[in-house]
Amino acid sequence: GKMSAEAIAFSVVDANGKVVSVGDTDKKFTMQSISKIIALMVAVQENGEEAVFKNMGYFGSDKPFNHFGSLEITGKPLNPMMNAGAILTVSLIEGDGETAFQKVLKMVRFITKNNNINYSEAVYLSEKETGHRNRGMFYIMKNSGLINGTEDQLDNYFKQCSIEVTAEDLAKIGYFF
């Protein structure tokens, strides 16, 4: 279901790792683009920084997160925090089927020390059903040879964006980085 607009929580982790939270700390929400940094970490861990950034940029951009004009102009995504780059990033994580997603989920659980974290099936299915722009980016990159796998890789991206966390989990992720 949808998150209540009235729900609010605030969590911080101090320099000693102590978590302080107030508000609706048990309310879960999906990570969406926050998951991109975790997938990037897994991809770099497996492949090395040079291999990951061989086919995408790493500089900031003033373009919207779902911009993919650079794929037509330069032939590669602007950076891993934009959707095209994030889709390419998850395609670099080794394994078939949902293995890449499971690695991202495992890393989120490790960082947060919360093995109960999972993804929202409803949000995943909605993203999969309506993610035409992302699907277009996937196929442009597949057509140009940046991506060699199947649409399972795109599904992994939709699933990673659907991982549900709480404000405390997110504060722990911020503390980790």
Language model features with spans:
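Long, repeat-rich segments with strong aromatic
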Residues: 160-177
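Catalytic-loop motifs flanking and including active-site residues across diverse enzymes
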Residues: 33-35, 39, 81-88, 133, ...
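Active-site-adjacent helix/loop patches that line small-molecule binding or acyl-intermediate pockets
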Residues: 43-160
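A short acidic/small-residue loop/turn micro-motif
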Residues: 26-28
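Generic structural signal for well-ordered secondary structure
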Residues: 3-5, 13, 31-37, 61, ...
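Active-site SXXK
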Residues: 17, 30-53, 173
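Short amphipathic alpha-helical segments at helix-loop
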Residues: 22-23, 155
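A short, well-structured edge-of-sheet supersecondary motif
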Residues: 1-22
